[in-house]
Amino acid sequence: MATSKVLLSNVLFVFVCFGICSAARTLLTLEDRVNLHVGTVVGGYGGGGGSGGGGGGAAVELGGGGYGEGAGGGEGAGAGYGAAGGGHGGGGGNGGGGGGGADGGGYGGGAGKGGGEGYGGGGANGGGYGGGGGSGGGGGGGAGGAGSGYGGGEGSGAGGGYGGANGGGGGGNGGGGGGGSGGAHGGGAAGGGEGAGQGAGGGYGGGAAGGGGRGSGGGGGGGYGGGGARGSGYGGGGGSGEGGGHGGGYYP
């Protein structure tokens, strides 16, 4: 009788131990699954404005990073922007400005027809294209990053742009265009204002010896841009027929 009680007690003890181990293993498995899914953060993208609207918010890069597709705009819309790795900056409609990319550059948006100054965004490490002016717009210049970027754009009344840190900005084409101002080590002389007529011929800088030409015709509006260093900033857009905003913003 005593032997049966001892045997039964041992069997019950073994079952209790198995139950405790099984419960602990289940809890650990659930915790691992939760930890596997938590922390996956996806970068969003910013929206464009409506008629006369401003820019959207900033795209975010966390870990593997999201993407930075910039939104286009309607009439007078604001800018989009790109996250690290590039993407397109948002183009404006009438009078809209554009946003720049981050580490991989990207395209800065240009001003539309009737717009004022459009601010094109430059890349932090990869340069990028500056914004171009539209018909009647006071053209948007592009700011380069560590690499050179292109300056102002085309169109009647388009102005020049600022050069990058190591490269000059190109001048605008079309009537009343001004040249692009040079960068720290680059060329690109400022465009002249000697009356109306043929557009400016501002040159590409891109080095200590680089020089830009001077153009005849009225001076256009210069622009400058901002890209984020790691995340993306955004460029503000102007209203229809008005001046644009400027780039900027830093989102770590």
Swiss-Prot record:
The tissues where this chain's protein is expressed are given as: Expressed in young hypocotyls.
Segment forming the signal sequence? 1-30
Say where the protein is mainly found.
secreted
| Any Gene Ontology CC annotation | extracellular region
Q: Does the keyword Repeat apply?
A: yes
Stretch list, region Disordered: 231-252
GO terms for biological process, alphabetical:
cell wall organization
User: Where can this protein be found?
Assistant: Secreted, Cell wall
The entry's keywords: Cell wall, Cell wall biogenesis/degradation, Repeat, Secreted, Signal
- Name the job this protein performs: Responsible for plasticity of the cell wall.
The protein's name in its UniProt record: Glycine-rich cell wall structural protein 1.0
Give the organism the record lists: Phaseolus vulgaris (Kidney bean)
